[in-house]
Amino acid sequence: MDVRHRNHVKVTGRAGGPVVMLAHGFGCDQNMWRLVVPLLEPDFTVVLFDHVGAGNSDLSQWNRERYASMDGYADDVLTLCRELDLGPVVFVGHSVSAMMGVLAAAREPGMFAGLVLLAPSPSFIDDPATGYRGGFSAEDIDELLESLDANYLGWSGTMAPVIMGNPDRPELGEELTDSFCRTDPEIARLFARVTFLSDNREDLAAVEVPTLVAQSSHDAIAPPEVGAFVHDRIPGSRLVTLNATGHCPQLAAPEETAAAIAAFAGTTA
């Protein structure tokens, strides 16, 4: 199997430079990083890819059993690292991909020079028993998934602007809506369940590689308490709160996002 084809891999930037691997979130593809990439290319080897089922990945490689949990995606990340053979990478995971990086690094820490967890959430669902605040009640998530199942395109048009934030810049929400609408609805329904129902809180403590937790100053999907929780649970991690708002700072504030990635990667890669 050619993983470069399967995951539509692109390698760009400075040959021989420290390696930064960028992983997109739900309903997106590698194009979400397009404003950040030119800012990283002068100093880093940049690896872009699409998760199987997203973007220009090989859809024939998608199957329900493998991608019904975060584990299948984490396995793909490790396979990419091995097959590309670029040495330890700084893995930058946005949103749900942050937890894929956590799982992958816990399994094979030698593959990673570090992790950047951008707008991460180990669980979107509040847990009153422990006091954990994920931002949504279980009922909220059930309603969200029911709405997605009933009318994926309609759900995309409603939710994308909420996820993106920045209501004064509606073009950002429109871009995310378009990205959602390009995703196969069947694949999106399953990936939404992986995204919104997974609970990776107990996996955080297993991370041993240098980690930067980067969160927006206001994010309707992952409130500040979530970033603080991730930082608290990953030993030795750093936490930075960006001035950016919304759940996709790589689009809303690419310069600030790239600067945070570069500052961290430059000290760990």
Regions found by a protein language model. Give the residues of each.
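Acidic catalytic loop of the alpha/beta-hydrolase fold
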Residues: H218-A222
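Catalytic active-site module of serine/aspartate enzymes centered on a nucleophile-bearing elbow/loop
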Residues: S237-A269
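Conserved alpha/beta-hydrolase "nucleophile elbow" surrounding the catalytic nucleophile
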Residues: H24-F26, V89, G93-S95, S216
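Flexible "cap/lid" loop of the alpha/beta hydrolase fold
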Residues: V102, A106-R107, M111-A150
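Short beta-strand/loop motif that positions the catalytic acidic residue
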Residues: V207, V213-Q215
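Active-site loop/oxyanion-hole signature of alpha/beta-hydrolase fold enzymes
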Residues: D2-H5, H51-V92, V96, A259
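Conserved alpha/beta-hydrolase catalytic His-Asp/Glu region
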Residues: D126-D127, G131-G135, E146-A205
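Conserved HGGG/HGGXW glycine-rich cap/lid loop of the alpha/beta-hydrolase fold
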Residues: H8-R66, L80
